[in-house]
Curated annotation (Swiss-Prot):
Residues 1-58 are annotated as: Disordered. NCBIfam families: rplO_bact. Residues 21-31, 42-52 have a biased composition (Gly residues). InterPro entries: Ribosomal_uL15, Ribosomal_uL15/eL18, Ribosomal_uL15/eL18_sf, Ribosomal_uL15_bac-type, Ribosomal_uL15_CS. Belongs to the universal ribosomal protein uL15 family. GO terms for biological process: translation. This is Large ribosomal subunit protein uL15. GO terms for cellular component: cytosolic large ribosomal subunit.
Length: 146
């Protein structure tokens, strides 16, 4: 085999279909667009969601709710993440950021009760779920709202 004999693998290269290039191509004359009408014109077509003049679905459905601009976004920390700290440690939001356990803290940290905690820790955070408080205290630790 020589360099000039190299061929691409069968089926790896697809020839671009050149439309509107003669009747013999099978895609000449109207170039696969049919006859006349809005969709046959250059730049023609209807916008997404257009239903032929019928009131579209997005206008038939009522508006619901609103976005609260004062919403607080808490960074979530689960119990199984707290297991990486030594027993007796005071886990604060600053410590969590320092150890790169959490990042992008916007309005504070909320501790949730997902996973198991088997060390007694003093956990300080902005919010706690009821199950997290129960699990931390069951492990002999304390919770404190900052």
């Amino acid at each position: 085999m020589k360099l000039h004999e190299l061929q691409p693998a069968e089926g790896s290269r697809k020839v671009r279909n050149r439309v509107g290039r003669g009747i013999g191509s099978g895609n000449g004359k109207t170039a696969g667009k049919g006859h006349k009408g809005q969709k046959a014109r250059s730049g023609g077509g209807v916008r997404p969601g257009f239903e032929g003049g019928q009131n579209p679905l997005y206008r038939r459905l009522p508006k619901r709710g609103f976005t609260n601009i004062h919403r607080k976004e808490y960074t979530v920390v689960n119990l199984d993440v707290l297991n990486r700290f030594e027993a007796g440690t005071e886990v604060t939001p600053e410590l969590l950021i320092e150890t790169k356990t959490v990042k992008n803290v916007k309005h504070g940290i909320k501790v949730l009760g997902n996973g198991n905690l088997d060390k007694n820790l003093t956990v300080k955070a902005h919010k706690f779920s009821a199950s997290a408080v129960k699990a931390i205290e069951a492990a002999g630790g304390k919770t404190e709202v900052v």
